[in-house]
Amino acid sequence: MTSTKLIAILIASMFSLFSNHVIAENHKIDMLNKLGKERMIYSKKVISINVNDEITWKSVDKGHNVEFIGLPEGASKYKSKISKEAKYTFSKSGIYLYQCTPHKAMGMIGLVIVGDDKSNLDKIKKVRVYGKSKKILKSLLKGL
């Protein structure tokens, strides 16, 4: 193997490793008591991201958290502490349904679609939600 070919292979390998780290993004979602006319709400109800992207949920107003209640096969369950910033890196593609545990009946839910994979949509539709979350989830899923 010539030194030129070896250098080209090394550069291509380094670029490949570097580009995987550059592509991952950190998305921000605020946990709020009020946004416009809506109460007990995440600043984004639905977000589409890539595999290995991270979401940071910021507790702008106290008393909120993030709890996954529906997720793709093989994904890790997650529940953050109340009133604390939450971070999660999404390594599995699919739909994630999450809620604010204290405000689940008030409709404080959200969806993350990872990798444009909706293969677990039927599973998400079967997740039991309460109160106002029933109507909101139905509306969010209709929009997918």
Residue ranges, per PLM feature:
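Hydrophobic helical h-region of N-terminal Sec-dependent signal peptides
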Residues: I9-F15
